[in-house]
Structures are given as C-alpha cells and as structure tokens.
Amino acid sequence: MGLVIYDTLARRKVPFEPAVPGHVGIYVCGPTVYADPHLGHARGPVVYDVLRRYLLHKGYKVRFVSNITDVGHLTDDADEGEDKIVRRAKLERLEPMEVAEKYTWSYFDAMQALNVLRPSIAPRASGHIPEMLELTERLLARGVAYERKGSVYFRVRSFPEYGKLSGKRLEELRAGARVEVREEKEDPLDFALWKAAEPGHIMRWKSPWGEGYPGWHIECTAMSLKYLGEGFDLHAGGIDLQFPHHECEIAQAEAAGFRFARHWMHHNHVLLEGEKMAKSTGNLVLLHDLLEAHEPMALRFYLLQTHYRSPMDFTWEGLESAKRGYGRLLHAYREVRGRKKTAPPGTTPELERALDALEKAFMEAIEDDLSTPEALAALFAFLPELHKLLPEAKAESLARAEAVFHTLGEGILGLFPERVLEERVSGPLLEGLIALLLELREEARRAKDYEKSDLIRERLRALGVIVEDTKEGPRWRLER
C-alpha cells in the first residue's frame, strides 16, 4: 500500500511520496529550552521517531532536522511579553545561554532514555541569526514587511493565503484580535520578524535596524530552508503550533518566494486531569520523574497506545496498565530468544503463517497514518498463537520470530533496545521478594487455593521469573 499520512494542509489522508526518490527531508519543531521537559514534550519526538524508523526500514535516507529554540519565544507566544529563557535566567540567576544549555541537555537526556534517535541536525536558533536577518531583508525588499522603531513586522494582508493551514480567515482573526496592539503595527495581525531590544534586554544582536532579536516564527523558517531546501517533504509539530506558528512560517517562506513544506503533520496534546500539560500553567508531570520511577520503554509504549492525532489522557492507572502490557511483549520476545538456542532444527509451518499474518497486519497499521495502537494490537493478537506453538517450535522459525520482533518492535516502534533484553536485576532484595511470593504461593497450594497459586506463578512469569515445581519444592530462575 505504501505510507499514507493525514496532511493538515490537505485536510485528508494522502500518499507520502518524497520529492526526491529514496530521500526524505523532515523538520520537526523542537523544544523551547527554559525548563525540564514534561510528558507532553515526549509525545511528538516518539511519534516522529516511529515515522523516521519506518522510513529507514523501507530503505530511505532520512535527514531529520529538529531545532532548539533558545531565543525569541516570548511569554505570550505572540509579540509581547518577555523572552521565556531570559525570564528563567533571572529566576535562576544564570546567563540565558547557561539556562539554554542546561535544559537542552535535560531534553536530550530524556530523549535518549526514551530510545528516540538523535536528529540528523539539531540547529539552535541563536546560531542562525545571519540566516534570519537575510530572510527578513528579503521580505522587506519584496514589500511584504515593514520596519517601525527598530522592529520589523510581516504585513499579513500582503499574503492572501494566510490561514490556509489552520482554516482561519483574516476577517475572523481581525474580529477577535486584541485592541491594545502595539502602535507601530499597521494591522493587529502583523507579526514580528525582528524585535528591537528594550534597554536591559540581555539577548541581543546587531541588525540593519538596530540591536534586537529574532521573532519566534522566522527561526524555524530560516533553519528548515537552510538544512532541507525548498519544497522539503514534511514539517511536523504539536497541534498548538498549527496557529499561529506554522501559519506564519508558511507566510514568511512563500511571501519570500520559496516553496515550503509539501506535507504537514500535527500531533495532539497530552492531557492531565482533562487539561493540556503545559509548563506555563504547572499542569504537568515531569519527564525525568517518570523516567526515574518507571521503565522508559514502558513509558514509550504508553505514548504509542493512543493515535497521535487523538488527545492522550495521562493517568497513573493507564501507565500501570501499559507497564503490564509492555511486560507481556517483552516476556514473549525474551522467551523466543531463549528457546531458539535449544530448539531442534527445521521450521514450524503454523508459526511461519502466524508471522506472515503479523507482519501484514503490523505494516498495514503503520502505513495507515502511523496507527501505532493498531500496530501494537497486531503484536498482542500474535501472542496467543506464539505461546501455543512455542513448546514444539523449530529453530529456523524461532530465529525468524526473533527477527520479526526485532524489526517491528525495535526497528520501527523502538521498544526493545538491547538493554531491556539483557538487563537483569539481582541481589538480596530481589531474592527475598521472590522467596516471599513463593512462600505465599505454597500457603495457597496447601489451602487448595489453586487460583491464587496460579495467579502468583503467572504474575512472576510476566516479570521474567520462571517458577518450577520439583520434589524438593519450588525453584525459580530468571528467564534468559
């Protein structure tokens, strides 16, 4: 079938066909690095990581660009307020670039824990001021921007297609615009390409219009065009960036005479108690807290259980359920690896057919607008047949099953790095806890409470602890 994505600009699912055969250029809006990331910041990177992994699996060469916003993102996301990083620098009594560096690495560390591939290029806005100035001067020369008091604004009315991404109309936007706009603006909808620095503003650069700093929207336009060129394949980001950020990006690029992104994808919010997770409101769960307390791959699994275009409601119960579900898949993968070593040679036709069905269902799901919930469902649907066939399975079929688990589960979904397949917990605490559970199981057996006894055994098995009943009593071993 080939990959089909929901294109926000087209407002429908469309075939994803790269402009240059065999090559894909993707730009994803990255974080504004003024605080530690929360769970909402992980959703986009995980989703687009799956897309990237799928394309790599299909043999494409992928240039994946995701920026770091370390200047110009103001506190009200428009043209007023204080730079978010400058504000944090004052609170922490640090230089702005110290703040940016600190939280950039906080973000990268979290992404590494979640098994997200590093971007091909991770450009920082502060390192691309010349490109932004050049683009601003080009817009001025074309008459679609104007300078007032050292600031430069984009003239929205000069771009009739403004609103084509979000579906918003200029008349409606003007009707809802704030009255108390800056005096130097010709129109309330005009947005800043370059801002004159107020006295005492820390982050400032020289420009033809005086010292200042870039507007937020022009940063991504300049960097995406620099590293991916005109008409690159895909621009992606959170649904909250669709307007005004991405709308303004399109206006800037096309008004400057450049062909911009061919496709647009947007992922939905992560919600906590029905409200969007956000640093600005404090309604959040910090990513590092979750990663320290829970298996990172179970957290990644949790994020992939909901389709990227649907809101995701975070609950602790949902996370615990995801941990159990992930444990089932990991257990199955480990069991296949372990049994392969001692299985007799040959193939098992029933297992081969089950693997064929799994691969078909999985790829159909991924190629249908990255339906990761359906892809996971295909893996779970395969498990009963796998467990039924494992005791008699032959080595060649088990080797194929291992390869399929690796390709689908790790290669595309990114859920099974070697660390989780090999990592073992040991020590007195582990041994003591297992001994306690086995003692409770023996008490249940003596009381003929076989349901409870079986439940303890199965729960231990799901955690990778194999219990064997012998004449001398129960023995346990960690699954290999």
From Swiss-Prot:
Residues forming coiled coils: none
Motif range ('HIGH' region): 31-41
SUPFAM superfamilies on file: Anticodon-binding domain of a subclass of class I aminoacyl-tRNA synthetases (SSF47323), Nucleotidylyl transferase (SSF52374)
Catalytic reaction annotation: tRNA(Cys) + L-cysteine + ATP = L-cysteinyl-tRNA(Cys) + AMP + diphosphate
Cofactor(s) the protein needs: Zn(2+)
GO biological process: cysteinyl-tRNA aminoacylation
Family: Belongs to the class-I aminoacyl-tRNA synthetase family.
Subunit comment: Monomer.
Protein name listed in UniProt: Cysteine--tRNA ligase
Species name: Thermus thermophilus (strain ATCC 27634 / DSM 579 / HB8)
Higher taxonomy: Bacteria, Thermotogati, Deinococcota, Deinococci, Thermales
